[in-house]
Amino acid sequence: MSATSASVTRHDWSLAEVKALFEQPFNDLLFQAQTVHRQHFDPNRVQVSTLLSIKTGACPEDCKYCPQSGHYNTGLDKEKLMEVQKVLEAAAEAKAIGSTRFCMGAAWKHPSAKDMPYVLKMVEGVKAMGLETCMTLGKLDQEQTRALAAAGLDYYNHNLDTSPEFYGNIITTRTYAERLETLSYVREAGMKICSGGILGMGESLDDRAGLLIQLANLPEHPESVPINMLVKVKGTPLAEEQDVDPFDFIRMLAVARIMMPKSHVRLSAGREQMNEQMQALAFFAGANSIFYGEKLLTTANPQADKDMQLFARLGIKPEERQEHADEVHQAAIEQALIEQRDSKLFYNAAV
């Protein structure tokens, strides 16, 4: 497959095709990925986000990789939902150090009706600062997605984690179909999708290919595709898994770039374990988004000044924020605003 033909947006990838991409000689794969990348992005710009945990620990889900799960003893301090003002202060700090997108994550199976008004205030406040907004709150219903869209949420993160075939080995408290359903509700409400997965959980090459097939064969590609490397946390069932081969991780980024040519491919969790050379190779493979700052939910992340020093050495600059939604998403958001006028989600939270 030529680099030119691979840059065409497709939604009909087969397992054989994707495995053939993975099995190319390393240099050929990276050349193809970089060629595709340059057709759609400035190769020397990287989108910069900051992620804040707005509610930490005691999650009822049993994701085997996650230190926030209430099923495992990881020594993580449990915290209630943050006050809106503290979230806004953190967002202001993120903007000051160069982030253009502020992502808020809560350890929930799904947000409760009691918490939704506070969550919506967070979105409105961060949006008012001129930052793009992103949240990950677990499973959503249609009413909740419409409320978030009406509040100004730009992106919703809901990872598929792995292939449908391997998924049951990692989590039993939420089905794959439920994850896909949430993504469909997010899209219907006019928000953009952030969805990816994790390497290093014991999955096979077929599973890695299967994850990318699920993402690329959605009706619309996710605008953001985070590729995580497992951060092994003592107390979780995956704490003793073998390390991911760095070249295998780079291959995953490159294949994601080829299959989803217009998506931002995010170098996400696990970056603390990557040296500068591996990160540079990741950018060459087509990764063009990072989380920036000291913490990534509950695990360490390279410090902001180290990121900027690496950017300077590589001649990379942070991507500027897009100020306007495209017409399709804007129309859907306006419809959500109309439908939201009579929403039952707005109530007196003091009651």
Curated annotation (Swiss-Prot):
Binding site residues for [2Fe-2S] cluster: 103, 134, 194, 266
Q: Which residues form the Radical SAM core domain?
A: 44-262
InterPro entries recorded: Aldolase_TIM (IPR013785), BATS_dom (IPR010722), Biotin_synth/BioAB (IPR002684), Biotin_synthase (IPR024177), Elp3/MiaA/NifB-like_rSAM (IPR006638), rSAM (IPR007197)
Residue sites binding [4Fe-4S] cluster per the record: 59, 63, 66
**What PROSITE patterns does its record include?**
RADICAL_SAM
Q: Give the matching SMART domains.
A: BATS, Elp3
Q: What's noted on cofactor binding?
A: Binds 1 [4Fe-4S] cluster. The cluster is coordinated with 3 cysteines and an exchangeable S-adenosyl-L-methionine. Binds 1 [2Fe-2S] cluster. The cluster is coordinated with 3 cysteines and 1 arginine.
Listed CDD domains: Radical_SAM
Q: Which Gene3D superfamilies match?
A: Aldolase class I (3.20.20.70)
The EC number(s) attached to this protein equal 2.8.1.6
Name the cofactor(s) required for activity, per the record: [4Fe-4S] cluster; [2Fe-2S] cluster
Which stretch is the leader sequence? none
UniProt keywords, alphabetically? 2Fe-2S, 4Fe-4S, Biotin biosynthesis, Iron, Iron-sulfur, Metal-binding, S-adenosyl-L-methionine, Transferase
Task: Name the catalysed reactions.
Answer: (4R,5S)-dethiobiotin + (sulfur carrier)-SH + 2 reduced [2Fe-2S]-[ferredoxin] + 2 S-adenosyl-L-methionine = (sulfur carrier)-H + biotin + 2 5'-deoxyadenosine + 2 L-methionine + 2 oxidized [2Fe-2S]-[ferredoxin]
The biological pathway it contributes to is: Cofactor biosynthesis; biotin biosynthesis; biotin from 7,8-diaminononanoate: step 2/2
Instruction: Provide one Gene Ontology biological process annotation.
Output: biotin biosynthetic process
One example of the protein's molecular function in GO is:
biotin synthase activity
**Keyword Ribosomal protein set for record:** no
| Function statement | Catalyzes the conversion of dethiobiotin (DTB) to biotin by the insertion of a sulfur atom into dethiobiotin via a radical-based mechanism.
**Self-association and partners:** Homodimer.
- Family listed: Belongs to the radical SAM superfamily. Biotin synthase family.
Name of the protein in question: Biotin synthase
What organism is the protein native to? Stutzerimonas stutzeri (strain A1501) (Pseudomonas stutzeri)
Its encoding gene is what?
Answer: bioB
